[in-house]
């Protein structure tokens, strides 16, 4: 049994109820169930944690110190485990150096290919750079002759565009027996009158080594002259073909071939890897030269990042209709010092501080932004205490002042505030290409490494499939190209054919990042591994789902066990084995409701909500009517970031509007990067850099824009759902109002674990202590003083209805809702969390443990409790992430409730149940990447189906 199955006995991690589970090995297994039913507790916190822990324990203590310590999960036993690999959505690299190419290791193979088979070119003239032997150069010179009478002058270009008199050079050359030199195109004798040159201008000096007739009998003489010339001129030789006349041609050309276009009868050769014309030399190529993370090839200006940071004037002056006295220069508009400096600066520049910024002379604006040089400016200053004084300053400019303030900021908060005035620009030296010019001039198949990485995965695949090599290069390139093609094919197979290899991983969505790691794992070709994935279908259009499922099956067919936590119906139906957790969430979950093949699950009893949806006993109904646009439109014109093709779009107000389209079609570029930021700037008076667009109209009909994204609600374990939705203040006030607290004189602050007073001082309110293990990983143990409760004994003695503050934090939202049902203010906030499907999370659950989808729904709950004006514009990006069919139904009712109140809800979504429930659909496409970026259809779901363009209509036709 242990050989063909993973057998788990008595799993009790988190909310698991001492369950026994048997999972077949080498199969595709889907774990499904409601949010909070225990899926991740079983897959990640039990199976993966134990598999990883056992593997790490088998290593030496030295190796273990570099790996994270994992606690033993709470279970009786687990047999049949393999080494486990987890592919989740939280571990995306935010390093600006990490790209799709580096993550998938394709870039490593590209570096090897370019180093071994790349053809170097001169970055200036584009000519191929080749190293040649003396004999090869001699043969090429010989080939310049037209018969037995053609003569040539062989020269050594010793000075190429340098200033000076070169008296010593001429003396040394004469001593060595040379008779003639060509100076700036004119041949002069060394043994005649002393040569005097103007030391203030650049000169070109070529030593005449020999004059020969280009005939085969002179081969050894030519080779000898080449050898002599190259020894004088760092491996270079200049040849002037003289024709049949014995007289020396006086070239009007004033270069020895070092700075540009040679005369027709002149030729330069090089023994080294260097451009004979421009002198650009290159060492023998190594893979490290093509790495933007190594100093050998990285652009010296940006050190390989490709961008430089600059203070952006439009962020410093977000509203140019304001004057300086009205605070148009936002970072200099508050406090006592800077407003007075600005006033003095205006006086010095002879401009009025009452004039709107947009009406100020350009010269004055430049002086304010970039400084007034060494000019002394008198500042008449009134201190806070009312004392008048003055002094003189030099003004370095607003940009320099902001940079200095950021560099000297004493807190992260202050630094973050000043960071808001900076924007990224392509590095002016490398134009964002990250590498040195001579490395960018190396080509394979006519493309530089930068041009190859700028291709999408699909285009790159086509490029390498059509690439041909000859001779020795074919033998070298074949195995490298094979690996590159295989990895590119995996990217295409997981639906990421639109991503370019130079795309930063920090800019990828959770689903995209996870599928990239999935492609990397397939590329590794391991067998006998246990892979655990967390919703790989996130962000994937139904069209791409079949390819993803085929990829998972391929991973299984290699001989691996693939466990997927998933809600997607197609994936569930494609599984070899399904485990359904439930029946409810939180304390009501943690049981194994059903297990078996998809067909067996479908016929499971009424306890399985999944079975009800798979069999069709339950379903999300199509709305009986669609809301008609009656409140006007938000109209965005001319959006053109990333792959958007000058897109214009109308969003009907007062409706539930869904933006759809295949992955990479431009949905996020249009909504997240352009519309959301443009609306925030216009309506919320934010200072954000929206992507380029021409016009935005209709904003007067809304009074607030709320973009509910999946970023964390807090970056530390001290932040939790209760603090985020404003419930924590109510709870602390409630405990402070109890008779016991009043008798002891406790204020609400006593019940905070962030400040001293009521918290446990042994662990500073963390509930755990970090123990440094030196060469072993640091371990965290519950605080012995407070037992992990975070509070001191006196604080915990204050109770409300028998529960102290620590016990309250440990309650789930559902439990707390029943507990506080008679306190409307608290119950209302808890109800919003429950309504968005978060009844299972604990009030004190650290923000760092919430998934992106959970964090997004906490934010949605926070918005739901605010007073509705009916004029709010909500934007959500894939809110169904991590949601079961039943959770989606619950979420839809919440979103429809917002629209019923008169608000507008705009959602980017792939879930067909959400799409079919929309009042209005905007479908992007037709494909991803360069083949997308257009609005291909818009209207009600029925109209999208009727339009019969793109893929979305085909899939929702089955749902209506």
Where are these regions (language model features)?
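Conserved phosphate-binding elements of NTP-dependent enzyme cores
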Residues: 1-960
